[in-house]
Amino acid sequence: MIKIYDTMTRSLRDFVPLTENVVNMYVCGPTVYNYIHIGNARSAVAFDTIRRYFEYCDYTVNYISNFTDVDDKIIKVANEAGISTKELSDKFIVAFMEDTAQLGIKPATQNPRVINYMDEIIAFVSTLVDKGFAYVSEGDVYFRVAKSNNYAKLANKTLEDLEIGASGRTDAETERKENPLDFALWKAAKEGEVSWDSPWGPGRPGWHIECSVMATEILGDTIDIHGGGADLEFPHHTNEIAQSEAKTGKTFANYWMHNGFVNVDNEKMSKSLGNFVTVHDMLKTVDGQVLRFFLATQQYRKPINFTEKAIHDAEVNLKYLKNTHSLPLTDQMNQDELQTYLEAFQEAMDDDFNTANGVTVLFDMAKWINSGNYDQTVKDAFEKMLQVFGIVFEEEVLDEDIEKLIEERQAARANKDFATADRIRDELAAQGIKLLDTKDGVRWTRD
């Protein structure tokens, strides 16, 4: 049985979906005002790998990941560029789809955009106001944190802890609140900002309400898994829980999953440190599948350290797997040994999607394959395991000239013309084709 580390309970829990053999997942997507950075890619790859493993286990996965296209940052960048917020968002949504495609990330079941859910957002906020969980102040609408049961339970904090942290705030927005911890559900429009009409005047939604509405509209009041980066645990996911459960009276998500950060040369990635790297730029020099493999091979909850050596190692390891995959089939295979690898892989991945251990199994299996155990059954199993990591190797077809040279070399060897055979081997090596003579015939790999 798959076990998931649930942030809410701080424990490993057996995964039991609401509907048998169906997984409903909502993963917070990017705010689309710039190209995604390697930290965004870590989250996208981690949850894509989790989705793929559920599918490997024959679950049907409804995978929802949103685009935040209404946000303070988007408004600021669009104004600076002299374009509309929609033009800016459209540009970076396209860039996101292109970049993540190179990382082998499957398209989501749906990618909802905030601008398409404005009526539903206004209705959601209105319900919270009617139920006394929210109040209007000078055109803004705020959520009453004090009325929420166990607010910040996800972040393992108490209301008292948060109030101490919030003490001393004197900004204009705080003056409009009943409590410094109250957060905006709806923001009154400022001059020149994009806005929508509402019962409280023109404005736009707050960040937290957007995800609650899109998740519940598509997947229902209670979902199986809600995921995102560890930085979203508080306040974003905390506030999602508070407002969603206040509206519905039901548990918002049964499992909360958060991926770890990406460090660059052992320092947390940040713009202030100047080690901020966009995926768009990285893909100009690093193959997308290599970057994907690097990100996928560390267990999703742990931090991962981005270095040139780590990328080089990922490239070398991926090449070994590719060469293994391209080996010609043999008649040799031990079913019991194959089953041992399949069970070891499942054991690793069932343990909170431990991809680090899963990759170890992959390489153990590759070593076994290289010893001659590679019939079609083994190849199919190997490919299915690779696909969990988003790795798909295209069947490489040698051109006719190279095929002809290999045949000529085989004929020369049969005639004991070893000088010709060696010459052809060297000629092929110069073209990047490495030959391996085995009892089952000649195998080749491309350097």
Regions found by a protein language model. Give the residues of each.
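Alpha-helical recognition segments enriched in aromatics with Gly/Pro capping
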Residues: 1-33, 48, 98, 119-327
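N-terminal, positively charged nucleic-acid-binding surface of large information/translation enzymes
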Residues: 9-12, 18-104, 437-440, 444
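Short phosphate-binding/catalytic loops that engage adenosine nucleotides
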Residues: 59, 133, 433
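Short, glycine/charge-rich beta-strand/loop segments that flank catalytic centers
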Residues: 67-71, 93-96, 106-121, 139-148
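Short, polar/flexible loop-turn hinges at active-site or ligand-entry regions and domain interfaces
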Residues: 81-87, 108, 301-305
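Non-catalytic interaction-recognition regions
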Residues: 97-119, 233, 288-290, 295-296, ...
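Structural preference for alpha-helix termini/caps and helix-kink/transition segments
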Residues: 268-447
